Amino acid sequence: MDAFTPETIWNEYEELLEMTRRHSFSSRIRKYRDLSILRLLGEVSLVVACDSNASNGEKPNDTHRNTYDETAVSALKVPTMEVLATGATPIVIADNLCVEMEPSGRKIISAMQEELDRCGLLDSI
């Protein structure tokens, strides 16, 4: 790893700004299926993973009938494990639930928080 100097940090910052203006991050992004790794500064990267869990839950028309606890763990585990597999530390979970907040969304979020706590990740997110 190269040593950071004010000049190298400034140069990389300028490069990121220019890429933002051009909407061209391709030289700094590596993609693996639904996992994206954006190199920020030096060897510091932002790792983003996503997954979908559609039609999974307790609603009458859900094709995969599961409790909200099972749905929460299912939605949480794949992207979290993908981020952990890169050696990164999860810092943000976006749940993107497509259900009403009460009672379904609240139950799923609560179950996700319990699972993160059980795994020792709740305090870092």
Where are these regions (language model features)?
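Compositionally biased, intrinsically disordered low-complexity regions enriched
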Residues: 1-2, 69
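Glycine-rich phosphate/pyrophosphate-binding loop regions near the starts of catalytic domains
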Residues: 16-108, 113-125
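Basic, amphipathic N-terminal segments that precede the first structured/catalytic domain
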Residues: 2-10
